């Protein structure tokens, strides 16, 4: 959909994730409790044995009460995630203003938007692998530094090429912040207490994710788009010192030789996964906008990307420390969780993109007012996140809450199709609330089902794998939604009696449909004509909602195949928090 569709290709990694993983010598899925009971010593990443009391009764005594250092470190991680979530969703709405100011072309705008998402996507499994080999903190510090530098480069840019460079650096850093904060949270908490800290972290993440478009619109309209970059610096300045001074994790034993340490990494696997994902994602991003779906520019890289990823999958059976170990797929619960994560990403990211647009296109609200209309949904999401912290102990597990979350999300997504031209204020404000509640409940209870991934050394790899699949699901969901929008709009506008002349002439090209939304409030056409155009837009959004309802229902089906996990284990990750 041209320039406007480029804006739709935004990152929206707005979920909370943590995996529960334990060390076991065999390959059968077991609970954390079993894993702790059956081992008298825990083997660290470097092969060093840790006495049993450090992993058994001692943990039971220490974990219920958290120290001040733990709490401050957690606040630092949550603050860093808030910055990442705001930045991830702020650019899309401001990109037309940036392109106009810097005289950027459509292709440059495309890369400015895609580079952030793509770099964050491909680097998540890489950062996770590095953190497993060298410890969590060094790559986290590097990620924060890259994000900080990228924000400055973006803020001072004088041309679109510099904007792209800044977004690439921010993508590298943001992807690391996202995955490593999740991994560290899993290391720091037991399975029983994890829902509490997931709920606490969900609050700044949900607020940041929804605030992003409003921040972008406010700066682009009333100040300068450069503040989208500058505002990251003081916000990151809150979280970084807290993490640096108070995050005390058990170090990973390293060899004296740098070469031996570097040999721990699966270099070939990293190259294959980065190249494969990049080649595969690019045609998904430009299909229907830069090139048609049937063009060789779309099909050739798509098939090449699949081929490289297949090679990567087979190759990962060879390294001693693969980036994606095959043992991660030995659990039915883990596999169903991955499928659920993909579907969750598709539904969430698509609706985060198109919900504000239905307010602007059908209800004729400005970008800022559309964000205000979604505030009740944000508030409910935060409340549900807080309540969910208590639900897991009450239910005695995650499975039934997970299924309830999918039911609520399916119903809430279906209700969005009730939007209509001239809907009442109560309808406009209330329809997305159930969807928001389902999203909040699901994001907190989906990922802990990865308890069947049992090797404690695989914590980072498993989370990196999940976040990559979830983000990839979001990109696929956006592609599906954009294709639906194009197809339905083209068919529906042709079926109306509206003459696409004068101020409506741009709508002859479906690529202009989203960009034209801003003009709907002021076009000089008869009321009946505008009403017909608005109903064409409405039909596009309703079809997207119907499709996402189906995907949500499929997610509910996946939850029927997951097994309950034991909440009584007090086991922590190898790189656990230490006083």
From Swiss-Prot:
Glycans are attached at residue 335. It is found in: Membrane. Induction: Expression is not regulated by the sphingofungins biosynthesis cluster-specific transcription factor sphG. Residues 17-62 are annotated as: Disordered. PROSITE patterns: MFS. The sphingofungins A, B, C, and D, show a limited antifungal spectrum of activity but are especially effective against Cryptococcus species, fungal pathogens causing opportunistic infections in human. The keyword Aminoacyl-tRNA synthetase does not apply. It is a multi-pass membrane protein. One of its GO terms (cellular component) is plasma membrane. Disruption phenotype: Does not affect the production of sphingofungins. Belongs to the major facilitator superfamily. This is MFS-type transporter sphD. It comes from Aspergillus fumigatus (strain CBS 144.89 / FGSC A1163 / CEA10). The gene is sphD.
């Amino acid at each position: 959909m041209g320039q406007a569709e480029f804006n739709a290709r935004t990152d929206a990694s707005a979920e909370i994730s943590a995996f529960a993983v334990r060390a076991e010598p065999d390959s059968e899925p077991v609970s954390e409790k079993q894993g702790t009971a059956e081992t008298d010593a825990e083997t660290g990443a470097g092969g060093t044995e840790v006495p049993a009391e450090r992993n058994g009764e001692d943990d039971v005594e220490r974990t219920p009460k958290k120290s001040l250092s733990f709490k401050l470190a957690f606040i630092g991680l949550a603050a860093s995630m808030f910055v990442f979530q705001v930045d991830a969703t702020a650019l899309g709405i401001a990109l037309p203003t940036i392109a106009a100011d810097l005289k950027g072309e459509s292709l440059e705008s495309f890369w400015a938007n895609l580079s952030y998402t793509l770099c964050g996507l491909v680097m998540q499994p890489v950062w996770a692998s590095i953190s497993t080999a060298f410890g969590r903190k060094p790559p986290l510090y590097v990620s924060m530094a890259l994000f900080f530098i990228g924000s400055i480069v973006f803020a001072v840019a004088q041309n679109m090429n510099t904007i792209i460079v800044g977004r690439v650096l921010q993508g590298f850093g943001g992807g690391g912040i996202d995955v490593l904060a999740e991994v560290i949270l899993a290391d720091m908490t037991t399975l029983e207490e994890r829902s509490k800290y997931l709920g606490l972290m969900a609050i700044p993440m949900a607020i940041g994710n929804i605030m992003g478009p409003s921040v972008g619109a406010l700066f682009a309209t009333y100040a300068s788009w450069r503040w989208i970059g500058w505002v990251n610096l003081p916000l990151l300045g809150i979280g970084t010192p807290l993490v640096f001074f108070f995050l005390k994790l058990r170090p990973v034993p390293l060899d004296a030789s740098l070469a031996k340490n570097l040999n721990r990494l699966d270099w070939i696997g990293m190259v294959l996964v980065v190249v494969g994902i990049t080649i595969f994602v690019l045609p998904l991003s430009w299909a229907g906008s830069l090139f048609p779906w049937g063009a060789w520019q779309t099909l050739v890289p798509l098939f090449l990307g699949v081929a490289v990823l297949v090679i990567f999958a087979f190759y990962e059976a060879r390294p001693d420390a693969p980036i994606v170990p095959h043992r991660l797929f030995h659990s039915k619960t883990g596999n169903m969780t991955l499928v659920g994560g993909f579907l969750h990403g598709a539904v969430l990211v698509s609706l985060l993109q198109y919900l504000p647009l239905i307010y602007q296109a059908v209800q004729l609200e400005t970008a800022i007012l559309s964000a205000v209309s979604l505030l009740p949904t944000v508030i409910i999401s935060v409340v549900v996140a807080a309540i969910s912290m208590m639900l897991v102990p009450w239910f005695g597990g995650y499975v039934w809450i997970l299924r309830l979350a999918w039911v609520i999300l399916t119903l809430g997504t279906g209700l969005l199709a009730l939007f209509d031209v001239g809907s009442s204020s109560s309808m406009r404000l209330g329809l997305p609330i159930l969807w928001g509640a389902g999203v909040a409940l699901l994001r907190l209870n989906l990922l802990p089902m990865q308890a069947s991934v049992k090797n404690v050394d695989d914590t980072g790899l498993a989370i990196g794998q999940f976040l990559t699949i979830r983000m990839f699901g979001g990109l696929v969901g956006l592609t599906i939604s954009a294709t639906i929008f194009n197809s339905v709009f083209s068919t529906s506008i042709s079926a109306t009696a509206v003459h696409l002349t004068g101020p409506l002439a741009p709508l002859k090209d479906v690529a202009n449909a989203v960009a034209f939304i801003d003009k709907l409030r002021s076009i000089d056409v008869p009321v009946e004509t505008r009403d017909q155009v608005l109903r064409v837009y409405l039909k596009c959004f309703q079809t997207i909602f119907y499709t996402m309802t189906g995907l949500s229902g499929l997610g509910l089906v996946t939850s029927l195949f997951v097994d309950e996990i034991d909440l009584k284990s007090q086991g922590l990750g190898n790189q656990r928090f230490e006083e």
